[in-house]
């Protein structure tokens, strides 16, 4: 559906050349929600603006719907862009016209017939649950409502791809969740492919199927959201995953606890998150776990949780208990045993 092949972007400044993208390649499958996450300056905004050639790449190929956009004429590119919708952090609504006209005007300029415009405006305002505000002006809307209008406007061209450039970063947490729910609904009901960029792990875990992590203009890790959450490899990826779990254990406390036992992180995914495996292990083996922190969050279609525990007992019994937990589908990290990577506490 979307494929970037060795895409680079170099900006020329007074101080010299700045390489915003470094030979980046990735694929987005038809119908999926693909997220790109990274800190400020990682290159994610440049990347997403290259997808519809708002930024022309210095090198590489951008293939959307089996068309290499970098080879198209101006007229051909304009036509191809009609199948690529885009929403932004800043909404970009016309302040002097109504909600209805904000959606209808671009369709009019594109030569869509009047009756079809009326049909589409109503259809997509109903999808974003704002048809009753069609005669309102942007100044009369909340931030979340403005973003819903922007989404309806993008959808009114009936694109096959929707690009989201930090579309929720200016919104409060509750409104962010409502916009994410709307994007997920659109993806599932309309089947539109969504490529989004964000610096918030909450966005990734709520609606994405797959994710790429960017740093210094390059993709440093990618995979399914489940893979990234349960087995992050790069230190930056680990920081993003840990940001989804608020609890932090002070270094002094860790040091003191490690004198009398092992500090272990247990990660649960899907069905295993509901199993009383820890309780069973406590009864079956001579171990005494003390829960230091815990959190359960929801990925797109399944639960994911973490428990940080202080496990006391004879080493042999602790080893057996941790092996048992692994057999139950629980990911075991940390401690003095060789059960996985060193756990990070934030």
Curated annotation (Swiss-Prot):
Membrane topology reported for the UniProt record: Peripheral membrane protein
UniProt-listed Pfam families: ABC_tran, NIL
Any single GO CC term annotated in Swiss-Prot or TrEMBL for this entry: plasma membrane
Family matches, as CDD domains: ABC_MetN_methionine_transporter
Keyword Nucleotide-binding carried by entry: yes
PROSITE patterns, sorted: ABC_TRANSPORTER_1 (PS00211), ABC_TRANSPORTER_2 (PS50893), METN (PS51264)
Ranges where the ABC transporter domain occurs: 2-241
Residues holding ATP: 38-45
SUPFAM superfamilies linked to this entry: ACT-like, P-loop containing nucleoside triphosphate hydrolases
EC number(s) recorded for this UniProt protein: 7.4.2.11
InterPro entries: AAA+_ATPase, ABC_transporter-like_ATP-bd, ABC_transporter-like_CS, ACT-like_dom_sf, MetN_ABC, MetN_ABC_transporter-like, NIL_domain, P-loop_NTPase
Catalytic activity annotation: L-methionine(out) + ATP + H2O = L-methionine(in) + ADP + phosphate + H(+); D-methionine(out) + ATP + H2O = D-methionine(in) + ADP + phosphate + H(+)
Keyword Lipid metabolism attached: no
GO molecular function: ABC-type D-methionine transporter activity; ATP binding; ATP hydrolysis activity
Subcellular localization(s) per the UniProt record: Cell membrane
Enzyme class label: translocase
Domain of life: Bacteria
Keywords carried by this UniProt record: Amino-acid transport, ATP-binding, Cell membrane, Membrane, Nucleotide-binding, Translocase, Transport
Family of the protein in this entry: Belongs to the ABC transporter superfamily. Methionine importer (TC 3.A.1.24) family.
Function: Part of the ABC transporter complex MetNIQ involved in methionine import. Responsible for energy coupling to the transport system.
PANTHER family hit by this protein: AMINO ACID IMPORT ATP-BINDING PROTEIN (PTHR43166), METHIONINE IMPORT ATP-BINDING PROTEIN METN (PTHR43166:SF30)
Subunit structure of this chain's protein: The complex is composed of two ATP-binding proteins (MetN), two transmembrane proteins (MetI) and a solute-binding protein (MetQ).
Protein's UniProt name: Methionine import ATP-binding protein MetN 1
